[in-house]
């Protein structure tokens, strides 16, 4: 599905990002793992061998993310795909959210997606081909209580995806967004369910999922790989909810 493709993944050292890397490599791609924790990114890349390269970079730092994309291309070849996975969540209604918290959530989720895309797009535009998969959330599709900043940020990512598709689809670059529900076994999933995995909280959240379970990193990764591949050649500007039916009810 991804033979000879070179895919950069932000937040690629753990969780969903690492699952995307595994799935992309199985599909034939080489991957650049870009993560704020550079040592973790390099360790993960070393486990993949020649199919991967890892580097530390903060997606909110334009110089750092631009250098990371350039390094990825030197190590692996021209980028043909980008997965904007790096993100953070936070809790608080509007009246209870500090501006510093709001700004940080916006910076990582929205500005980080913008900066990583900008850094990757120049080469894609020169070559006239590419695929970008942004990561939204069901929180960008519906209102989630006490998650004002996160809902606003992921809603912005969803509409930025549509705008990018409008700009670049005619130039050979497809742009889509995956919107996961709660994903078990990730830092964000643990944050949503509580660090002590409170059974009552978990049961209340699980009741919102018609399929009767939370997602796994692999569920989300397979959706991303599909959108990166030529099997999705006529798919652009799409919002793919991978949420076990949560937003269907």
From Swiss-Prot:
Active site, UniProt feature: 150 (proton acceptor)
SMART domains, per database record: PKS_KR (SM00822)
Keyword Membrane: no
UniProt EC number: 1.1.1.269
InterPro entries: NAD(P)-bd_dom_sf (IPR036291), Sc_DH/Rdtase_CS (IPR020904), SDR_fam (IPR002347)
Protein name, entry field: 2-(S)-hydroxypropyl-CoM dehydrogenase 1
Binding-site residues, NAD(+): 16, 35, 58-59, 85, 154, 183-187
Catalytic activity: (S)-2-hydroxypropyl-coenzyme M + NAD(+) = 2-oxopropyl-coenzyme M + NADH + H(+)
Site residues, Lowers pKa of active site Tyr: 154
Miscellaneous section: Enantioselectivity is dictated largely by changes in Km. Is difficult to express due to its tendency to form inclusion bodies in heterologous expression systems.
Induction, per UniProt: By aliphatic and chlorinated alkenes.
Pfam families from the UniProt entry: adh_short_C2
Record Gene3D superfamilies: NAD(P)-binding Rossmann-like Domain
């Amino acid at each position: 599905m991804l033979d000879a493709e070179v895919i950069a993944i932000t937040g690629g050292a753990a969780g969903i990002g690492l699952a995307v890397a595994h799935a992309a490599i199985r599909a034939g791609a080489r991957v650049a793992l870009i993560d704020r924790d550079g040592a973790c990114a390099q360790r993960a890349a070393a486990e993949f061998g020649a199919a991967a390269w890892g580097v530390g970079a903060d997606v909110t730092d334009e110089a750092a993310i631009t250098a990371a994309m350039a390094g990825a291309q030197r190590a692996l070849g021209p980028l043909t795909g980008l997965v904007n996975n790096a993100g953070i969540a936070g809790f608080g209604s509007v009246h209870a959210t500090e501006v510093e918290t709001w700004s940080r959530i916006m910076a990582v989720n929205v500005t980080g997606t913008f900066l990583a895309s900008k850094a990757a797009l120049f080469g894609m535009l020169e070559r006239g081909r590419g695929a970008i998969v942004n990561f939204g959330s069901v929180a960008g599709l519906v209102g989630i209580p006490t998650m004002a900043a996160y809902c606003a940020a992921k809603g912005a990512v969803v509409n930025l995806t549509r705008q990018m598709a409008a700009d670049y689809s005619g130039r050979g670059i497809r742009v889509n967004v995956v919107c996961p529900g709660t994903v078990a076994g990730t830092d964000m999933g643990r944050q949503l369910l509580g660090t002590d995995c409170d059974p009552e909280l978990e049961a209340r959240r699980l009741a919102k999922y018609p399929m009767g379970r939370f997602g796994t990193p692999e569920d989300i990764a397979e959706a991303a790989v599909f959108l990166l591949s030529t099997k999705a050649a006529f798919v652009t500007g799409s919002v793919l909810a991978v949420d076990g039916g949560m937003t269907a009810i």
